[in-house]
Structure formats: structure tokens, C-alpha cells
Amino acid sequence: MIIIFVHEAGHYLIGRWCGIKASVFSLGFGPQIVGYTDKRGTQWRLALIPLGGYVKFIGDEEGLHGTSSQSLPIVDGSFGSAHAWKKAATVFAGPLFNVLFTVVILTFFFFTYGRVAIEPVVGSFVKDSPAVQAGLQLGDRFIEMDGQQVESFEDLMNYVTFHGGDPIEFKMERSGQVFTTVITPKVVERDDGFGNRVRSGLMGVGVPVDPDNPARLDPAYVKHIRYSFGRALREASKRATFIVTQTVFFMGRLLGGKEDHCRLSGPSKTVKIAWQVSETGFLSLLNFTAFLSIGVGLINLFPIPPLDGGYLLFHVVEIITGRPISAKIREIIFRLGLCFVLLFMFFALFNDYFCWFS
């Protein structure tokens, strides 16, 4: 619920900043459990069905963005009386706050606990793997991948996982000499740790291990990085940007039929993962919350009503053309978008169970 609260708080706070008055701030849908009305006249609610939330602004009786074909009176301080850029900012604020919330969580994580990282050095190979075929040797160090700096083995694995079948240009260091090579990770099927078989990229390199105990990492290549607040903020922003770009990349591949649909998490799979992660400790749950918050923000930016991105598109068109899209056209697009979203939700739910039992 905290992710939903952050999302709706974004709409509410930026709406207030733009001079738009809110009549309702609700966590959940359906019958009210508890609530109170503040001095500004906003009713704060906790509702029975915890599947989302909403902010209802004055003069926007159909919800946050107004889809009714009926003309509503323009009242000072209402959503309808606001300039298009203010309405766009209010709509965009929800997903933006989700991303900022992730940055806040990760900044706290890096500043308080730091980061244990394995240096990106080749410690072993999988036989006949793409890395072997490319001529890599033990002790080779990864410097860059497709122009991005490689700071840890985790960075390397995260990137390769999402780029199975795609050529990746690596900048490597060997005995003080820098060279460039292109490696195409092969696509393999593996267990994702949550009972699903998924496809992912495999390059075939392993971490450096202790020569005296191959079951342990070589301590010479393990470093505990401590961050000042400024560095923690920069690292958190960098990590959040990476999550956003890889999520967008994944969705593009999924829609293009190039990604394993079992990597998509619907509501039931998300709850299952959250429960399993919570059993491993607070830090793991905190990290999962950061990832989930960005996911909620990005999904809401899809340019399809009733998602935020659909209404944001309406307001951007109004900014460009100088006049709003007619209420009738908005309502038609809304109904089509709602059907699409419901179908996608049904697919995500069915996909969860299909991937569990297939």
C-alpha cells in the first residue's frame, strides 16, 4: 500500500501546488473503512479493497482525469479550470513520485549499508560458451559493455540476462592491455528462483573463486563499498535509471515476441515473490519495494486510458493544439483503453498460473 500511497501523493501534492483542490484521497476502492476530512475539505479514506487508490479533484467528478461526455461547470480551483500544463504535471506526478521513491529507498540503502560487490573479472568458464568462443581468458576484466561502465559482476550479469541473442560490445583489460570484443549471449532456460522456468541470456563466465576452496569467492575480488550521502544519491539515481531502461527494453522485447512471457509478473506472482522476499529479511524486502515502485510508475505511463499515460497524452495534445480533445472522443478512447487494460490484467493473471503449472 505504501507504493500506492506514494503514487497518489504525487498526484495530490503537485495538484495542490498547481492550485487544484482535491475533494477525496483514497487508498483502496469500495466501502470506506476509516476516514476524516481535513481543514482544506479533502476527505482522506482507507477503503475495503486494497487494489489501488485515487485522488478526486474538485470539478472532476469522474475521477482524476475526467472522461464524462457531460459538461461540468468550471469552478475556480477545479481540475477543469487548470491550464493544460498543470493538468499534465498533476497526471505525470504519480509515476514520477514512484521513481523518486525508488531513488530515496536506494539512497538510504547505499548510504546506510553500502554495497558488497564482486569485481568483474573472469574466474571460470562454461564449456563451449560464447565467452570461450570469443577467446576470453581467466583474469580478463570487463571495463565496459555497450558503452556502459561495468563496476561489478552483478552489473554484468544483470545486463547479459536481458540481452540473450543480442550482440554486446565489451571493452576488456588483459595484462594491462585494453581490447574490444563482441559477444552474443546465448538464450538458455533456467529456474528464476520462484518456481518458474524462464529464458535468459548466458555468456558463460563465472566469478573468481578461492583457489583453496572453490565453494567460496576469492576474497581478493570482493569489495565492500561505502558511500557518502552524495555518492549514495548518485549511485541510487544510476541504479534507478538502469532499472527504468531495462524494464522498458524488456517490455519492448515482450511485446515484440522476443522475450519469455514467464518473466512477466502478474498480481498473484508479485504477491508470491513479495512473500518469499520478505522471509529473507528487511533489506531484501526494501530492495524489492524499490523495484516494484518503478514498475508501478512505468506501467502507469503506458499511453492508454485509464492509465496515467493515456490522460497525459490527452493533455500534451491540448498543450500542442491549444484546445482539448472533445469529451466524446475522450470517452470512446477511454472505453477502448479500459477494455485493453482489463484484457491485459486477465492475461497477466492467467500467465502467472500458466507459468507455475506448465
UniProtKB/Swiss-Prot annotation:
Keywords assigned: Cell inner membrane, Cell membrane, Hydrolase, Membrane, Metal-binding, Metalloprotease, Protease, Transmembrane, Transmembrane helix, Zinc
Instruction: Quote one Gene Ontology molecular function term.
Output: metal ion binding
Q: What GO terms in the biological process aspect are recorded for it? A: proteolysis
Matching InterPro entries: PDZ, PDZ_sf, Pept_M50_Zn, Peptidase_M50
Instruction: Look up the EC number in the record and give it.
Output: 3.4.24.-
Record-annotated PDZ domain positions: 102-177
Transmembrane spans = 89-111, 282-304, 332-354
Under PANTHER family, the record lists: MEMBRANE METALLOPROTEASE ARASP2, CHLOROPLASTIC-RELATED, REGULATOR OF SIGMA-E PROTEASE RSEP
Q: What is this protein called?
A: Putative zinc metalloprotease BH06270
